[in-house]
Regions:
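Nucleotide/phosphate-binding catalytic cleft detector across ATP-hydrolyzing
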Residues: 1-78, 135-140, 144-158, 179, ...
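Active-site lining segments that contact anionic ligands and/or coordinate catalytic metals
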Residues: 87, 182-186, 234-239
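Glycine-rich phosphate-binding/hydrolytic loop that grips phosphoryl groups
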Residues: 215-253
Length: 253
């Protein structure tokens, strides 16, 4: 479903781009990304039911990389982590190329499930509480499973959620180190789960890197993309990346 070229060689000499050059032997080192056939068939079945057709397919970290960490800044050892609901997808850039992909099977739902248990609410209410927590008010109002309306301050809410945020940071930081071989020099967090309060700082602490080098990426970090006057948060990076990847013929048919 996708690939990333690490190095091109022409007659055993490293090249940035082979186009327009002549030689006797071409060598390409790349990382290929594969999905089980049943997963791909399931994706096609879902789109068929909506009356849509698949134009192209790619891997989410590849798509996000294309707009957040383009080739000109991949000399830096950067980790990109797309924290969704059920999984956290990881891509590692180093020495001018994308060198590794990984996935942690924990993400934003871990925090939602912790909220369910601690506040006696259903899952949808837990999601609503997370959304309220990212807003401008100082308190969060919710209705528990007994039908009682409750109010809690943001400070108390964040304190009660901090163990699950810390646990999520543990798993992600370990997966990043396993993929990279060590802590990266910097990290971009994208996806809805990346907005969890305190997650960026927790990851910086666990990886031993400066807090200023772990950023939650949104519109301001998108390269070579004009989204007009729209204010796009980190949850939009991957969808925009998928569109860019498809339009620039970097995806798979």
């Amino acid at each position: 479903v996708g690939h990333s070229v690490e190095h091109y060689y022409l007659d055993d000499y490293a090249m940035v781009n082979l186009e327009g050059h002549k030689g006797d032997k071409v060598t390409i080192e790349l990382i290929g990304a594969f999905l089980p056939e049943v997963v791909v068939e399931g994706l096609y079945a879902a789109t068929d039911k909506t009356g849509l057709k698949v134009k192209s397919m790619t891997l989410e970290p590849i798509a996000a990389m294309n707009v957040i960490i383009p080739p000109e800044i991949r000399l830096i050892n950067i980790a990109l982590v797309d924290i969704g609901a059920g999984t956290s997808d990881i891509a590692i850039a180093r020495d001018g190329a994308i060198v590794a992909y990984a996935m942690a099977t924990v993400a934003g739902d871990e925090i939602s499930e912790d909220i369910v248990r601690k506040f006696f609410v259903d899952f949808n209410m837990a999601e609503s509480m997370k959304i309220q927590a990212s807003g401008g008010t100082d308190s969060i109002t919710y209705r528990d499973i007994f039908g009682r309306e409750q109010t809690i301050s943001k400070a108390d809410f964040f304190e009660k959620c901090s163990p699950s945020v810390d646990s999520l940071a543990d798993v992600i930081s370990q997966a990043v180190c396993d993929a990279n071989g060590q802590s990266p020099a910097a990290m971009f967090l994208i996806g809805g789960g990346s907005m969890a309060n305190g997650l960026a700082d927790a990851l910086a602490d666990k990886l031993g890197i400066d807090h200023g080098r772990v950023a939650v990426g949104g519109q301001e970090f998108m390269k070579n993309v004009d989204v007009g006057d729209r204010k796009l948060g980190p949850e939009y990076v991957t969808p925009v990346g998928i569109a860019v990847t498809a339009c620039t013929n970097m995806a798979y048919d």
